[in-house]
């Protein structure tokens, strides 16, 4: 019998600060607000799910994630427009539902559709963190249950803060690590919704931005 060895929880402290009427960081590109539950209304269930369905959900999530290792932002002479076009026509497109929703943490916000996801998070992120390693640390936690899957790691990404595109802070060229979780809803054969807790305050602290000190001012 397996026993729990560790437990990690990400509380969106920045969203708590936002709801209290303070905003200590740059404006989000996406829409801020409370995350909705799954469109299928079945996020919590106490029934045993079909094992084959769970395996298929996990495989789809992992295959999509592996496709993200294709990095057009590192192509010689790549421009903002070039990378954006490549991401909109990236192999990831095969796995996302046409009506996908991406729910990011406070500081990034929510995005609708692949175009919104690319414009509000993926493109700025990739332009800022061109030097990154998903696999050195990795999303080593992999769980699936029916039409849901999740991956995570503590930490799960190591990268170099190389531009101001993501979150809007001047590049520091510092190496940072990220605490990230990905929760997926698989619907109509594709990934329909993606909830992504990220410890933004922890990332900002590594590049010299203390959000908790800022709210005191």
Where are the predicted features?
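C-terminal and inter-domain tail/linker signature
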Residues: 1-217
């Amino acid at each position: 019998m397996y026993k729990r060895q560790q437990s990690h929880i990400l509380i969106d402290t920045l969203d708590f600060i936002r709801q209290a009427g303070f905003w200590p960081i740059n404006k989000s590109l996406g829409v801020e607000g409370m995350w909705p539950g799954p469109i299928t209304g079945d996020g919590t269930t106490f029934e045993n799910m079909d094992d084959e369905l769970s395996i298929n959900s996990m495989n789809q999530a992992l295959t999509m994630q592996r496709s993200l290792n294709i990095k057009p932002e590192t192509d010689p002479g790549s421009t903002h427009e070039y990378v954006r076009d490549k991401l909109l026509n990236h192999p990831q497109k095969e796995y996302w539902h046409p009506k996908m929703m991406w729910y990011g943490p406070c500081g990034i916000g929510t995005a609708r559709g692949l175009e919104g996801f690319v414009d509000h998070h993926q493109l700025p992120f990739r332009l800022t963190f061109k030097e990154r390693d998903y696999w050195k640390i990795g999303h080593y936690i992999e769980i699936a249950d029916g039409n849901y899957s999740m991956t995570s790691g503590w930490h799960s990404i190591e990268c170099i803060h190389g531009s101001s595109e993501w979150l809007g802070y001047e590049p520091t060229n510092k190496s940072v690590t990220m605490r990230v979780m990905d929760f997926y809803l698989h619907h109509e054969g594709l990934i329909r919704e993606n909830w992504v807790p990220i410890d933004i305050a922890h990332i900002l602290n590594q590049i010299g931005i203390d959000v908790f000190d800022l709210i005191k001012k």
